[in-house]
UniProtKB/Swiss-Prot annotation:
Quaternary context: Interacts with MARCHF2 and STX6.
Compartments where located: Cytoplasmic vesicle membrane; Early endosome membrane
Annotated pathway: Protein modification; protein ubiquitination
Catalytic activity: S-ubiquitinyl-[E2 ubiquitin-conjugating enzyme]-L-cysteine + [acceptor protein]-L-lysine = [E2 ubiquitin-conjugating enzyme]-L-cysteine + N(6)-ubiquitinyl-[acceptor protein]-L-lysine
Entries under InterPro entries matching the protein: Znf_RING, Znf_RING-CH, Znf_RING/FYVE/PHD
Organism (species): Bos taurus
Name of the protein: E3 ubiquitin-protein ligase MARCHF3
CDD domains, A to Z: RING_CH-C4HC3_MARCH3
Keywords for this protein: Cytoplasmic vesicle, Endocytosis, Endosome, Membrane, Metal-binding, Phosphoprotein, Transferase, Transmembrane, Transmembrane helix, Ubl conjugation pathway, Zinc, Zinc-finger
Positions of Zn(2+) 2 binding: C87, C89, C113, C116
GO molecular function, one term: zinc ion binding
Residues with the Phosphoserine modification: S237, S243
Segments crossing the lipid bilayer: 145-165, 182-202
Amino acid sequence: MTTSRCSHLPEVLPDCTGSAAPVVKTVEDCGSLVNGQPQYVMQVSAKDGQLLSTVVRTLATQSPFNDRPMCRICHEGSSQEDLLSPCECTGTLGTIHRSCLEHWLSSSNTSYCELCHFRFAVERKPRPLVEWLRNPGPQHEKRTLFGDMVCFLFITPLATISGWLCLRGAVDHLHFSSRLEAVGLIALTVALFTIYLFWTLVSFRYHCRLYNEWRRTNQRVILLIPKSVNIPSNQQSLLGLHSAKRNSKETIV
């Protein structure tokens, strides 16, 4: 442990895709008081100096339960949801909520821990098509999807009626021996439907590609872990007492 002055804000764990490396934990005094208690910042960094996590904590000097285990993502305790220890991380970074971890794995599109690179057993379920239609992604993709749907609903009946009128006129011209006009109307019908089918195919393939990409990166992640990784409440109390004793020995400069 090392101590120094600092001014940091808590941040979410970043996505570290490099190889696993030894981590270094440092405790730094922030020089601020919360409810009359000093604060310190715990930083976890790799051996190459890359910052992995920063957590602002309050030094537990009055009550041993102020430093009970908390989720490393939302920094909340186990009052609303049980804490898990599903990977090989230890200490304050070893506990996490199931919902927080599932949301993180879904957002980052990964299946492993960013710190210890432990690979989780997960089940990925694709989200329904209706959800993509309601929220397809960025604003320009929403406008493109809405515009193509309006054009399709407007052009489809228009092209059908126009083609039927052209064919009907070509038949009438054939009855009156006006073959040139009949051939012109038939060619116009073929060109009209060719352009319509080409535009429909291109638009359909474009939106299918966007949907497949959205479906691949926006899956619902279900964490498959045994119940034994849950941290019981009595063990959480023991961890809190142990952390309080450990923090009382730390020197804040």
